[in-house]
Amino acid sequence: MSYLELLKLGAPEAVVVISALVVLAIGLMSQRVSAVAGVSSAKPPKKTASAVAATGWCSLVAVLGLAIAIAAVLMLPRNANLFGGMLVITPLTSLFKIICVALAFFTVCLARSEKSLRHPGEYLAIILLATVGLMLLVGSEELLMIFIGLELLGLSLYVMAAFDKTDLRSAEAGLKYFLFGSTSSAFTLFGISLIYGMSGSTGLVTISEKLATVPVQPLLATGVVMTLIGFAFKIAAAPFHLWAPDAYQGAPIPSAAFIASASKVASFVVLGKIVLVGFGPLHGSSGWHSMVAGWSPVLAVLAALSIVIGNLVALAQTNVRRLLAYSAVAHAGYTLLGLVAGSRDGFSATLFYTAIYAITLVGAFGVVAVVRSETGGDDLKDFSGLAGRSPLLAGCMAIFMLSLAGIPPLAGFFGKFYLFSAALRAGGNYGLLWLIGVALFGSFVSLYYYLIVLKAIFVDEPPVTTRSSPDQLRSDLLQRITVATLAAAILFLGLMPDTLAARILAAVS
């Protein structure tokens, strides 16, 4: 393969990297100008008009870079290999690269209005570098490249979580996320090393062929379990979810939105490839009448624990961001249902659900960002009377909460419907009925705390001190447009779910 062909196949990632470098350069130059102005005036540097303009230029370059990256993905061939198969191009990888880049696009839009960020150029550059990690993850079918993508993504997310130096909770969130993320990486790397030692390969297809011909040995089983534990940390599945509440609450809101959405999409895509392609021969069975050892029972237990713990603990939350964090734990359990089913339909349902969930979470965090800028907090009481202050935001938040609860005709309902249908058909003789029952129980419980949020928005009286100035409304305009766009996407995908579901099903086949 010539260098020109290699550049064409790697164009989406290259465009995002170049955009990150340009954004970083603009941000650094604007800081230098501000620092020189501060020294010459013998006063601390303030956010001057040039700094505001530089922030706008950084956002514009980031948005244009992501848009060009999407166009570059659309121009990729249907199937291709890079670096000897370490990276692959398939309809599935191309589709989810677009989804990940689109989520990064909306995160940049939310970050544009985040006034607490003192260095927006560096922040946007880190978002772009994290997006490169997402694209490498989605496009990889080789364990070594998967680990590289995980580390590039993880290092970026740790910095994003701790980026607000004026807030001690942000530092706490970054530290906890770093400690748990490092533990996750250690488990994943140790598991990969054991799998490589027992199979002699890091390619998923080769590993599958090897596992189909040799008996399962204790070291190999240990490697599989440790790899699954590492990914359980990444998707915040119980009991490996302890980092999520503090990270979601303490991190800057765009960071929390990105961690909750894009990183989970890529993690579920990769986890599905690993268990269904690489570990396929070790599937086992999670049926209540025919339990067989394998990775499927492990994921089934993680799913059940996540659904029960996430939903029950969410009932006690009074902070909306912590509520969304424990809700994310429960939704990780729902999403694992499709992988436990193990079929093509199950994997497709998992991918559809995680995409819908990611869109919904970015929108919900967008509403939280506007409310926080108006009231200074993100507790339930800060959402009181939102319907009177901003009917648009209240309506959008209602769409997001009801979609998360799985209420028709919103997209979240069809996501759960596809997951439950795939699980019901798997295993023979309704073997996964017990897990579906747990998921239905969790869905009923979750409806209560989602309605609590809507009660605060539409029923409770607003605080006397809550008011929005015209300047504040103008500064939050981009966030409001972003939230409205995401709410419209949830409505559209609820009315026409096959628009996305059929594409995913065709890409998986």
Pin down the residues of each PLM region:
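Alpha-helical transmembrane segments of multi-pass membrane proteins predominantly involved
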Residues: M1-S509
